[in-house]
Structures are given as structure tokens and as C-alpha cells.
Amino acid sequence: MQTNIRNAPLVLVGAGHAHLVSLRHWVIQGYRARAGSLMINPEPQAWYSGMMPGLIAGRFKPEQCQVPLAGLCAAVGLELVCSKLSELNADSGLLELADGQTIEFETLSLNNGAVAATPFEHDQSLQLLGAKPFPGFIHQWQSWLSSPPRQLAILGGGAAGFELAVALRISFPDTLLDLFSSRTLLSGHPPRLARLARARLKHAQVTLHENQPIDGITDGQLYVQSSAVLQPQAVILATGTAAPAWQRRCGLDCDADGFIRINPQLQSLSHPNIFASGDCASLPDTPHSGVYAVRQGGVLGDNLMAQIKGTALKTYQPQPSALALLACADGSALLSYGSLATEGRLAGKLKDWLDLRFMRQMT
């Protein structure tokens, strides 16, 4: 029988983009959570993903990319608990934390992100480093600064893989860098954006391997179609998102990949007292992207208030297309919107302005 269960009327798990925007929304609205409400996050600060490439390229300092959580939580009546969620039992309304705490909640909001996908077999003969979660990646990157790796393989031909590749070139000018894409580079974006990205990678002396999905890792080597193609010192996973293991066994209605299925009000389809947003959630026409998570934040903030008050919930409507800005490590950026694509310093200035404005709003 469990003892020392802590009761909380509202619990927010994870300081992702949607939760940060929700908290700022509450500050503006003058809303304070009921006594005993909690924010659970592994660290006392949240990393802003949009500025990570700039940090790696030396354009920003770590503190510029972090949102301190204590003051923001205190402003809306939340107690910050620095721990990691280990288990959720949705039916009983219980959370088990890594530090041994058990919390019983009335309303729960999950914005805990995701982990890097590993879509192949490996024998652990190479170090695998996920681009997410950010704290682990940043810690390893900082340790590499004093002893740069001989060769790195970056897996993932999306925006994250591209941005990491060109940023890591600045950090490690003498390291061999290889970027592997299972499809064409930046598939899903306009073809012109991919052409611009290829030119940037060539200029940065990053070797690009398109349409080469990794089959596995054995004896320190990467395999494509059962043939060894590379023997790097480490592998960085920018291969998209995977659900944390606990989501598959928590009792919530999840999709085939373990992401929590939600309705347009951002509620779990199976448990209406549980909300989910950002990378941990599954909603039609809503990619796992910070742009969409930020837009969810205002609706989520209003709906958590409404859930507690018993009033009507608002509906989140994903935008049909989103502006994409890919940092190029030198202050410029690639830009696409719909079928349009361009590049240059002006796009980089726009990205910096948007990122720094977001950080000013959060601090």
C-alpha cells in the first residue's frame, strides 16, 4: 500500500514551449493556480530549442537560451519540483517521480517532449547521442569542446539535422562530419530549400548521404543496405521524435507510435482531465514542431483554467502552413513558407528577432 501520497489539484509535467506560453498567458491574465499545484521538470530551467544551433555555433551563451522556471512558476502559484516523471497511471490519477515522490492529481497537463528516435538495431558499440532532450546533448557537446571528436555522423535529413551539421562545423572545424538522410534532404519542404541547404553543407565541408537509411550499427560501423559505410566516433540522432517508454504503458489512448491522442481542445481522448501538447501528443495536421507547440500554448492555458472552473473549452486550430527558418550558423538563415524558399542575412535577422522576442516574453 502506498503512503505519503502528495495531492495536487493541477500538475504540469515538462517545461516545453506550450507550457511556457501557458504560464506567460496566466501572468498576463492574472490567474493563479490553486494551492498545491505543481510544475514538474528535470531542471530548474527550460532550454529554448530555437536557439540551440546558435549556441552550438558560438553565437549565443547558454544563459541566453534558458528560461529560469522558479520565478515564472511562483508568479502563477505553481511550486516547481525538479524531478523526472517515471510513471503515470492515468486511471488512478497517480504520478511516480524519479526521486520517489508519488503525486495524486485532479487535472494533469503533459508537455514533456519526446526522445530521439532510433529506427535501427545497434549493438551499443558506438555512442548514440540524441539531439533531444537538449540538456543531455548540450552536456556532451560541452565536453567535446575540450577534446573534439575525430568524426561524427549525424542521422536525420530534416531541419534539425541540417542545423546541427552546419553549427557543429563551427564548433569542430577539424572534425569529419557526415549527414545521413533516409530520404532526400529536407523532404516535405520546397525543392529550392533543399538545393540551398545542399550548397550550405558543401560549403561547410559536411558530407551528405541522401536516400541512405541506416540499417544498424555493428562493431562500431554504420550499415546501409547491409554494407558498412562509416566508422565514426559517435552518432548524433536527429531522426525525429519517439515517445517516452512510460507513455505506452500509462493507460492513455495513444497512437501506434506511443504518442498521446488528443482532441482539438488538447484533451486526452480517453481521460478528459488529462491534457497533452507539443511533441508528446498526437493530433491530426499538427507536426511535432516548436512552431505548433507555441501556438497551442495560449489555448492550453485557457483550457486548463476552464477545466478547473468547469467552463467551456476553446478549440485549437493548427495553421495550414508554418514559416520555417533554418539557422545557418553564420547569422544567416534559410527561409520557406508554403512553396516559397530563400536565404540570406535578412532571414537570419528575422529568426534572431523572433527567438529573442520569445525569450524576452518568458523572462
For the regions a language model picked out, list residue spans one by one:
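Beta1-alpha1 glycine-rich phosphate/pyrophosphate-binding loop at the start
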Residues: Q2-L78, L152, E163-P191
